[in-house]
Curated annotation (Swiss-Prot):
Seeds and hydathodes of rosette and cauline leaves. Disulfide bonds join 226-237. Keywords: Abscisic acid signaling pathway, Disulfide bond, Endoplasmic reticulum, Glycoprotein, Glycosidase, Hydrolase, Signal. It comes from Arabidopsis thaliana. This is Beta-D-glucopyranosyl abscisate beta-glucosidase. A beta-D-glucoside binds at residues 58, 161, 206-207, 351, 422, 473, 480-481, 489. One of its GO terms (cellular component) is endoplasmic reticulum. Its EC number is 3.2.1.175. It is an enzyme of class 3 (hydrolase). Glycans are attached at residues 189, 466, 499. One of its GO terms (biological process) is response to salt stress.
Amino acid sequence: MVRFEKVHLVLGLALVLTLVGAPTKAQGPVCGAGLPDKFSRLNFPEGFIWGTATAAFQVEGAVNEGCRGPSMWDTFTKKFPHRCENHNADVAVDFYHRYKEDIQLMKDLNTDAFRLSIAWPRIFPHGRMSKGISKVGVQFYHDLIDELLKNNIIPLVTVFHWDTPQDLEDEYGGFLSGRIVQDFTEYANFTFHEYGHKVKHWITFNEPWVFSRAGYDNGKKAPGRCSPYIPGYGQHCQDGRSGYEAYQVSHNLLLSHAYAVDAFRNCKQCAGGKIGIAHSPAWFEPQDLEHVGGSIERVLDFILGWHLAPTTYGDYPQSMKDRVGHRLPKFTEAEKKLLKGSTDYVGMNYYTSVFAKEISPDPKSPSWTTDSLVDWDSKSVDGYKIGSKPFNGKLDVYSKGLRYLLKYIKDNYGDPEVIIAENGYGEDLGEKHNDVNFGTQDHNRKYYIQRHLLSMHDAICKDKVNVTGYFVWSLMDNFEWQDGYKARFGLYYIDFQNNLTRHQKVSGKWYSEFLKPQFPTSKLREEL
């Protein structure tokens, strides 16, 4: 373990091709000693991509327009409204109708890129091509991508951000079945051929660890499957088998990724493009320094290596094979060959870090947690917190964890290109939720972004990690899964009481200043 204390469509497309064709390692960071007095994009490598991120289900709305079919999250929010704060994404923040307005917000932020996802059931309403293609849905993403390029904003497209078509859930259980591999590959291949001449940055899957564990092991997210013995959620799950299903889901997901990437690399329109997976690890510190053992390496295998090791080396980490045993599916030799080297870069979503607490095995109640032999805690055995957590914050702020993870990936996974595909600060404003003036004064979010950019800068300059892009989560407040609309992550405040009006927050103003092509007038030393 390593320890460390802008104007026409043609022009827009040319910009994309120029950046894709550039050297993998961004060039020329300004690596001075100590905390820079003035801090901006000029302190980072030339060609570094700066952006914001969203996901289709969380922002689009318009669930009954353009022949869009239902996803498993539509079903989950309607079937279990109490598990999503009695909210749903039928309207969300209406990005489907307001994307042109929202692209102007991106321009106001001075960003280079925008991460979006394609809603599978908006393209294939029933999950597969033979059951019908929505021409309206296909055209929507053409229009969105064209509008981005017209405004010199690079699209980074996620093929799957958790919205499995409900028809495939009903037919065979979605990712629980190996049948999903063929259907996902068909869908992904369609998007590559449809948009590949315009889009040169792709992600197959967003946060596979969260998708599998939270959906099929602890039941926190859709489809909400778990065993009755899971603390906190077992009483809510109507079906499931913890300790088994999540591993099968991820196995099918990884094979879906491998076959989709094979299709991508044989797609002529996609030539010059790059593709990866967006992982979502936390960093772990030992809760008790006197009893560390192998807990940190093991839990990082379970949270990151579970999906990164197969796409890098062709198989699961040995620690997972040892701990999970027969419950962990096996790859064939042909599948290992297809998986190995199946990403051009590593996407990483980073939010927080935790203390790793050693626990005993529990063979009678298997789960991801008991298999990893690690539970999580925000405090050490001596009562020290992992990081600061403002009263309304959703997660502890520990920016060093970002640097540690980047260095860990470099040292253990072949020094890949890395894109920070999400990094953001969530807050629950409570009784002030609808107070626009209060909600836009998000100084804690500004501080969070500043600290994490400095940590990323250290990883690039001091650890020589090949980071080439950074995306804030999120452009604007949106539907945050089981938290509904209570958790706000945006650089823009959404006024849910007043026609979903967008208001730039303090963090958005700072980010726009940071991204100007010249050094800002503000001094970072004074702000921190």
